[in-house]
Amino acid sequence: MTNIHNHKILILDFGSQYTQLIARRVREIGVYCELWAWDVTEQQIREFAPTGIILSGGPESTTEENSPRAPEYVFNAGVPVLGVCYGMQTMAMQLGGLTETSDHREFGYASVSLENSTALFANLNDNSTASEPKLDVWMSHGDKVTRLPENFKVTGTTLTCPIAAMSDENRRFYGVQFHPEVTHTKKGLELLTNFVVNICGCETKWTAENIIEDAVARIKEQVGNDEVILGLSGGVDSSVVALLLHRAIGKNLHCVFVDNGLLRLHEGDQVMEMFGDKFGLNITRVDAESRFLGELAGVSDPEAKRKIIGKVFVDVFDDESKKLTNVKWLAQGTIYPDVIESAASKTGKAHVIKSHHNVGGLPDYMKLGLVEPLRELFKDEVRKIGLALGLPAEMINRHPFPGPGLGVRVLGEVKKEYCDLLRRADAIFIEELRNSGWYEKTSQAFSVFLPVKSVGVMGDGRKYDWVISLRAVETIDFMTAHWAHLPYDLLGKVSNRIINEVNGISRVVYDISGKPPATIEWE
């Protein structure tokens, strides 16, 4: 079996908003990497045995006395090191150079003139003139290196930053003041490939097929002939976990699909057809709609609704698990960002992936071992694996759907009548987005039920019915978002269909709020 962890890159996080992006780019190249806090110990680095190390950017200033520093062992480990932005500055400082606060903070596009050939920039040039190589890059820094460490040379300059890149070719130490991990740096991926593959010598074995083979082998080794239970929602993460486990242990996997009455139109039937009929999984459908809606009756506060939905799910799932007396393991769809976020919430920083991560919320008396086949993977990697396992692209690339489902898309109190109306309206909206080619152009689109009535006219009579709001946004990272400028004729068609086909809706509006100040979801 291919050893996909044999060659690996260690990324030390100094707090940049782009650090996870570095990890995703390295994985995209085909090499495994992990993201750790900057203050790891020498022992931890030795045990991990990285093939190369990347020092990330960060918001601190190396001119401050107590600013973060890389462990000294990083520069004595005998492996290549790449410093990015703050990572370059701390490398320079720690190896005997100098940094200063810059008179001109650089933020945005810049052109770096390349000089003194270096392996890091091999075959890279954004300039049409081969004799004057330049790179179009993205800068974001307030400090700059003003004196090189011994044995370093300048490999890149800008008009305001005389040392925009540096290298010590003998020790294979490299620094860039810009961010190669962002797409604004045109040759960023090629630069990282030069470092990871050509300089560090990593083999590109981190592929979907190899990851699947490795995950299946590890599941078999972990659970043996034991039985495993999984809460299958039909979302990407739990679906991929289900197929990996099914491939590894077959009928020893017990999937529980809790139909809470808060799903999209026909979604429950689609989940059963996909995983029960098509893939042949051992799956139980629990109709818990009345139980969820009963607990939600009279509750209008969004946070209270979320907590109720979470608690009822745990209770229902626990009731089902008690019927399976031989189950020894609980499978979860924990992914790598969950691990990083969980560690950061406890310690204030990302930490080693191997430290145990348990998503809270399940009762203490469920004394089951934890199986988390996706805990090393980013979301985009999970999607690639899903496609390789045979999940349809339409499902893999579906827009995000909140955990509480329609419970937070029906504003205020949740009632069956409201959910039924919203389901049908939302299905029309999504259908028309797909038909017009706009579904793929938007990052997230959905309908919201407003618990207010509005007067309308139908035929010769007046009607006094409910209001639906349509929401569609475009975003890269879901941290900020712009409302999608859908064509008027498309919005008109959706509105007409909803009002004519969904009895009980008299008015349709379109949400043109960005994030910030609004959030993407209404609740």
Curated annotation (Swiss-Prot):
Its EC number is 6.3.5.2. It is an enzyme of class 6 (ligase). ATP binds at residues 233-239. Signal peptide: none annotated. InterPro entries: Class_I_gatase-like, GATASE, GMP_synth_C, GMP_synth_GATase, GMP_synthase, GMPS_ATP_PPase_dom, NAD/GMP_synthase, Rossmann-like_a/b/a_fold. Residues 8-205 form the Glutamine amidotransferase type-1 domain. The active site is at 85 (nucleophile), 179, 181. Gene3D superfamilies: 3.30.300.10, 3.40.50.880, HUPs. GO terms for molecular function: ATP binding; GMP synthase activity. It comes from the Bacteria. It catalyses: XMP + L-glutamine + ATP + H2O = GMP + L-glutamate + AMP + diphosphate + 2 H(+). Pathway: Purine metabolism; GMP biosynthesis; GMP from XMP (L-Gln route): step 1/1. Residues 206-398 form the GMPS ATP-PPase domain. Keywords: ATP-binding, Glutamine amidotransferase, GMP biosynthesis, Ligase, Nucleotide-binding, Purine biosynthesis. GO terms for cellular component: cytosol. Pfam families: GATase (PF00117), GMP_synt_C (PF00958), NAD_synthase (PF02540). Catalyzes the synthesis of GMP from XMP. Homodimer. PANTHER family: GMP SYNTHASE [GLUTAMINE-HYDROLYZING], GMP SYNTHASE-RELATED. This is GMP synthase [glutamine-hydrolyzing]. The gene is guaA.
